[in-house]
């Protein structure tokens, strides 16, 4: 439920939630399923990303959470703005309120 609130999405596809404690999180905006092996190697308990394929959800070594492609990338603009503002304090940003996500949920 917390992930749904953080990523402002009505649903999250995931494989398992049986682990009591999540100590290490791997996060990739956009299509990050190619990082499953790396996340396991780095001992992540969960990989939060998008565009995870059906058969990848059978992996029992890590929790996979697919929050949606758009939803996983939406915060990158704020992060980039924060980084640029630290380097260039007088740089002005204007963020659009337009939702460009072509995916809708019922």
Predicted segments with their positions:
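Active-site catalytic microenvironments in core metabolic enzymes, especially phosphate/sugar-handling
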Residues: 1-106
